């Protein structure tokens, strides 16, 4: 988890030019993971697949709260099941940009928790998470200023 947290933060900075956290992404120990875990915006990762449904592999506490799930049950949730029709269309239209440029800003929208409750967000950011070999590891999403509606 510590390695994934470091990859998430480093990849965000590489692609957007901005820091995701207040702590250096190369910081020792679990400082990066702790800040990522307690980040106020929902941050989650899923597999990089367009032909299959992308399955979630990680979420911070805000992400688990937004999805109304646990880390254990997270792997049973698919990206296309939480996005509404408009969100799926936007993601599909931006997917090649995410893969080529490394990230994309997505407009405000709605999604749904695993319990079926509607969730609104002001903006979302999607970016490629690269491992230490600069290979694609997963896709990360940050849902900014989300709330149940």
Regions found by a protein language model. Name each.
Residues 34-149:
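Sensory/regulatory domains in signal-transduction proteins
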Residues 1-53, 71:
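Eukaryote-specific, low-hydrophobicity, charge-rich regions
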